Amino acid sequence: MGLSDGEWQLVLNVWGKVEADIPSHGQEVLIRLFKGHPETLEKFDKFKHLKSEDEMKASEDLKKHGATVLTALGGILKKKGHHEAEIKPLAQSHATKHKIPVKYLEFISESIIQVLQSKHPGDFGADAQGAMNKALELFRKDMASNYKELGFQG
């Protein structure tokens, strides 16, 4: 399940492109998530009222939250699998406070892949996509493991 050094390098190379403009990447990831899986919007009291893509694009709060999400994920990815210290508090809040099911983590992972494909096709070929999928799967597996320890069946 672990990634090779080369795979981590592919992940971090494309992530460098994300970090060049985290707010717009984060906004696009959340918009894709909410459009593709409208049920996920119900977990976000701040955004429930946003019904159209135009409303979502105009929301500074959505853009800020997208940046927060991708900043946290970037911190985890940079640990190259040695991310227990970063995962624990994230799993704690997502299991006990926000009650975010693991399935929703799969949905946002799909959205991240789609955004990277559309924004960075030249830097996100098949090898990079495969590596990012593995990295996001590792993240979800470790979140799910922490959820289980916390007694959250999400």
From Swiss-Prot:
Keywords: Cytoplasm, Heme, Iron, Metal-binding, Muscle protein, Oxidoreductase, Oxygen transport, Phosphoprotein, Transport. It is an enzyme of class 1 (oxidoreductase). It catalyses: Fe(III)-heme b-[protein] + nitric oxide + H2O = Fe(II)-heme b-[protein] + nitrite + 2 H(+); H2O2 + AH2 = A + 2 H2O. The keyword Phosphoprotein applies. Gene3D superfamilies: 6.10.140.2100, 6.10.140.2110. Heme b binds at H94. The modification Phosphoserine is found at S4. The keyword Cytoplasm applies. Residues 2-148 form the Globin domain. Belongs to the globin family. Monomeric. Monomeric heme protein which primary function is to store oxygen and facilitate its diffusion within muscle tissues. Reversibly binds oxygen through a pentacoordinated heme iron and enables its timely and efficient release as needed during periods of heightened demand. Depending on the oxidative conditions of tissues and cells, and in addition to its ability to bind oxygen, it also has a nitrite reductase activity whereby it regulates the production of bioactive nitric oxide. PANTHER family: MYOGLOBIN. This is Myoglobin.
